[in-house]
Design a protein with these regions (language model features):
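Jelly-roll (double-stranded beta-helix
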Residues: 1-288
Length: 288
């Protein structure tokens, strides 16, 4: 018998702000006080229209240490280049999973053709914490294509994409340091889906767009909302009142101290000071 994870609240995203000149984002957490350990932050960008341009928009060279960035492209395309020698482009449906760990410098810019032609841009960026034991490990880059992500067709006509973790026997392609589940879920109007999630995981239902009833009690309706869920319980029931686009995340809590400063997330303020010093001294490398 399944036990539903409790809805801990419902929250709308913060006001729109720009990251660089290419990403108009709304923050879903932690700006509203939501804590979903091991996840640190979730920004939702778009949908926004960009006019054709000659120069790629985005965020230029900047550092990270101590965590992972996960970027999911829904519309538009983004190029990535980092000081560890990794580069790639993610197109609609693709995922970029970058492990900053001991430190990288990277840039994120609109891809050349998207820059030239313009169009609708929509993406999500999620920050995933690393345990203390892995914070200074070697940086890693996973460019995951749409074709590599398993798709589960649901009985009501919707589907679920398994980006990380396991759902209904299907394993996601992303390699993670701790137990993390990340699912893209599309539900058709009138569809009901009881989604299993591990007992002991923190979790959240993120609404990109639509109207969904959670566990028969709480509603997310509109665009860019989040409902954090309890650790206790092993399922969440989703009922779509309209065509609905969701992102479901769950993870085993790391439960370690978190010290953050801008692009660095460590365990102590001393480690943050060292990260700043290492970056300024060029120890995280430079873009060629």
């Amino acid at each position: 018998m399944t036990t539903q994870k409790k809805v801990l609240g419902t929250y709308s995203a913060g006001s729109n702000h720009w990251v660089g000149d290419g990403f108009p984002v709304r923050n879903l957490f932690p700006s509203n006080g939501v804590d979903v350990d091991p996840f640190l932050m979730l920004d939702y960008a778009g949908p926004s229209r960009f006019e054709p341009a000659k120069k790629p928009r985005g965020v230029g060279e900047h550092p990270h240490r101590g965590f992972e960035t996960v970027t999911i492209a829904y519309q538009g395309s983004v190029g990535h280049r980092d000081s560890a020698g990794n580069s790639g482009v993610i197109y609609p449906g693709d995922v970029q999973w970058m492990t900053a760990a001991s430190g990288v410098v990277h840039e994120e810019l609109h891809e050349a053709e998207f820059t030239k032609n313009g169009g609708i841009f929509e993406m999500v960026q999620l920050w995933v914490n690393l345990p203390k034991a892995q914070k200074m490990s070697k940086p890693r880059y996973q460019g995951i294509t749409k074709a590599q992500i398993p798709v589960i067709e649901l009985e009501g006509g919707g589907h679920a994409r398994v980006i990380a973790g396991e759902l209904l026997g299907r394993l996601g392609p992303a390699k993670t340091f701790t137990q993390v589940n990340l699912f893209d879920v599309i539900l058709k109007a009138g569809e009901r889906f009881e989604l299993p999630l591990p007992d002991g995981h923190n979790a959240a239902v993120v609404l990109r767009k639509g109207d969904v009833l959670i566990n028969g009690t709480d509603t997310l309706s509109g665009e860019a909302l989040i409902a954090p869920l309890s650790e206790e319980g092993d399922a969440v029931t989703l009922e779509a009142k309209a065509d609905t686009q969701l992102l479901i995340l769950s993870g085993e809590p790391i439960a370690e101290p978190v010290a953050s400063y801008g692009p660095f997330v460590m365990n102590t303020h001393e480690e943050l000071a060292q990260a700043v010093e290492d970056y300024r001294a060029g120890r995280m490398g430079h873009l060629a």
